[in-house]
A protein has these predicted regions:
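A short, conserved alpha-helix within the catalytic core of class I
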Residues: 159-172
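Conserved class I S-adenosyl-L-methionine
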Residues: 180-213
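Short catalytic micro-motifs in class I SAM-dependent methyltransferases
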Residues: 155-156
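Conserved Class I S-adenosyl-L-methionine
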Residues: 68, 229, 233-306
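A conserved beta-strand element that flanks and buttresses the S-adenosyl-L-methionine
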Residues: 152
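Class I SAM-dependent methyltransferase SAM/SAH-binding core
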Residues: 61-134
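Class I SAM-dependent methyltransferase Rossmann-like catalytic core
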Residues: 1-59
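Short alpha-helix
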Residues: 212-230
Length: 306
């Protein structure tokens, strides 16, 4: 499949996309890639394990951290009669969730008694999970003092430096997880090398323009947790999957590219750099009908019952 735009059209589309809010690109990614079904399948497996391991009448409680509009909200709410809390620094994402909840009447459980309420919290996950004391304060201030049965980091650890992961995961594990509960994290694999992969795209452009090196290796982090036994009583599992993204609209395609390149939250590409990225993506991917390929790692940390 060959797609064509004039140079002026494609550069204008690339610059427009670079100005959009990240939650817009997040919606495009979750709607038009196979990421949502991939995470959904893994998430349902985690939930099944939780139901098997916990007492039968347990009303599960879940906390989704930094995942913007949380495309897995219907799964979480159906499974968690004790409620779902969405924590994000993005106020636009919070408003989007509130609108969806109101429209679908999820918070009032009109779909049936098995559906729990949805709450939103605006906070910086790096601050509220910086250490056990901060995490305990979050639990008492926003989670009614209750520990959670599931905490998710779905593509949200991108926005924390790798050096912060150990403290954030440890604080979550010790202060937010109930016995028998689990953490489910998902992140782009740091080791994929194919030319159409999001990993290679990031290495090429964030590396060339900012000297960035992707040290956010979730699989290696999980292996280190398991090897060091850093979380007492933890069962650590790692899996890797492949997802694809494509869209006939070049502006939408470029919006997802900017999200992957962490523009402008982490790396602010200049207009000239934006044009260079746009031209490369047009020539090597979109005009040829090549989808973006993402290898992504899943980390599941379960706190054994004690």
């Amino acid at each position: 499949m060959i797609r064509r735009l004039s140079r002026a059209e494609r550069l204008a589309a690339g610059r427009r996309a670079a100005r959009r809010r990240i939650n817009t690109e997040d919606r495009a990614w979750s709607t038009h890639s196979s990421d949502k079904p991939d995470i959904g399948l893994r998430l349902m497996a985690v939930l099944r394990d939780l139901h098997r391991g916990l007492p039968g009448r347990t009303a599960l409680r879940a906390l989704s951290i930094g995942s913007s509009s949380e495309p897995q909200l219907p799964i979480l709410q159906a499974a968690c009669r004790g409620g779902v809390t969405l924590l994000d620094i993005d106020t636009a994402a919070r408003a989007q969730v509130r609108a969806a909840v109101a429209e679908q009447q999820l918070a009032r459980a009109t779909a049936g008694p098995r559906h729990g309420p949805v709450r939103t919290v605006v906070a910086d996950m790096g601050a509220v999970l910086a250490d056990p004391r901060a995490a305990a304060a979050l639990r008492h201030a926003h989670l009614e003092g209750q520990r959670q049965h599931l905490v998710t980091f779905h593509h949200s650890l991108y926005y924390l430096p790798r050096a912060a992961w150990d403290a954030v995961v440890a604080a979550t594990y010790h202060e937010l997880l109930a016995p028998g509960a689990a953490i489910h994290a998902v992140l782009m694999s740091a080791s994929a090398t194919g030319p159409t992969t999001t990993t290679a795209l990031y290495a090429r452009w964030a590396g060339a323009c900012f000297g960035a090196r992707n040290d956010q290796d979730l699989a290696a982090f999980g292996r280190a947790l398991r090897r060091r036994r850093a979380l007492p009583g933890a069962d650590v599992r790692i899996a890797t999957s492949t997802v694809y993204f494509d869209h006939d609209d070049f502006g939408t395609f470029m919006g997802v590219v900017w999200m992957i390149l962490l523009h402008p939250q982490v790396h602010r590409f200049s207009p000239r750099q934006q044009d260079a990225v746009t031209e490369w993506v047009y020539r090597h991917l979109w005009s040829r009908g090549e989808p973006l390929t993402q290898r992504q790692d899943h980390l599941i940390v379960t706190r054994t019952r004690r």
